[in-house]
Amino acid sequence: MAPSFADVIAVVPAAGIGSRMQTECPKQYLTIGNQTILEHAVAPLLQHPRISRVIIAISPADTAFARLPLAAHPDIQVVRGGAQRADSVLAGLQAAGDARWALVHDAARPCLSAQDLERLLALTETSQVGGILAAPACDTMKRAEPGKPAIAHTVDRENLWHALTPQLFPLELLRDCLTRALAEGATITDEASALEHCGFHPELVAGRADNIKVTRPEDLALAAFYLTRLTPMETA
């Protein structure tokens, strides 16, 4: 039996400042067209009938979010984010109530397609651990010498994947793994890494490589181009 709609909530950690973008405002509030990156990122989540609520974790010093139309959306809930991504995600999970599944999406990843989201959500019917959207590595990968920009060796890319978001896990499992990983001083670069630290092996769901995260100034134009290439069916 498929899970009920209320079983899935989304958490969007949006408390970061995005220093690599070299802009005065946090990158999630930069605009593409007539919407912020955050609004583009959240739109597919709000439009999907399986997701009952989107919880956005923002910085206590954030003054921009309240001015967005998104702030008045009935399915949006705002919580206070933390110093690290994991802290913000945990704050969102604490506000999630009795939802069974938690889907975590980057605030600066505006090009999520509806098809990728659908494939990821299908894990709720087949997986006990959950998984992530990911794209197989296509480029030749080089490992650098420690502390200097020189090639140490070429890395076999056969089993390498680029981790993307959203990432989807049973809510209690994700909360427990994040809590334990933080307590044990583990490096948590995404939600899956917390599960890995605790001995779990999340599934890889092949996703589109154009589901990019806006991290550097040149990414903004690329994301704008990708958004124009998504059809209404792919974004709705």
UniProtKB/Swiss-Prot annotation:
Site (Transition state stabilizer): 20, 27
Pathway the protein acts in: Isoprenoid biosynthesis; isopentenyl diphosphate biosynthesis via DXP pathway; isopentenyl diphosphate from 1-deoxy-D-xylulose 5-phosphate: step 2/6
InterPro entries listed in its UniProt record: IspD, IspD/TarI, IspD/TarI_cytidylyltransf_bact, Nucleotide-diphossugar_trans
CDD domains: CDP-ME_synthetase
UniProt entry tagged with the keyword Transferase: yes
Catalytic activity: 2-C-methyl-D-erythritol 4-phosphate + CTP + H(+) = 4-CDP-2-C-methyl-D-erythritol + diphosphate
The enzyme's E.C. designation: 2.7.7.60
Site (Positions MEP for the nucleophilic attack): residue numbering on this chain: 157, 213
Family annotation (Gene3D superfamilies): Spore Coat Polysaccharide Biosynthesis Protein SpsA, Chain A
GO terms of biological process kind: isopentenyl diphosphate biosynthetic process, methylerythritol 4-phosphate pathway
Sections of the chain in a coiled coil: none
Single Gene Ontology MF annotation: 2-C-methyl-D-erythritol 4-phosphate cytidylyltransferase activity
Leading EC class: transferase
Pfam families attached to this UniProt entry: IspD (PF01128)
Disulfide bonds: none
Swiss-Prot/TrEMBL keywords: Isoprene biosynthesis, Nucleotidyltransferase, Transferase
Subunit and partners: Homodimer.
Similarity-based family: Belongs to the IspD/TarI cytidylyltransferase family. IspD subfamily.
UniProt function note: Catalyzes the formation of 4-diphosphocytidyl-2-C-methyl-D-erythritol from CTP and 2-C-methyl-D-erythritol 4-phosphate (MEP).
HAMAP family reported in the protein's UniProt record: IspD
The protein, known as: 2-C-methyl-D-erythritol 4-phosphate cytidylyltransferase
Organism: Cronobacter sakazakii (strain ATCC BAA-894) (Enterobacter sakazakii)
Lineage: Bacteria, Pseudomonadati, Pseudomonadota, Gammaproteobacteria, Enterobacterales
Gene: ispD
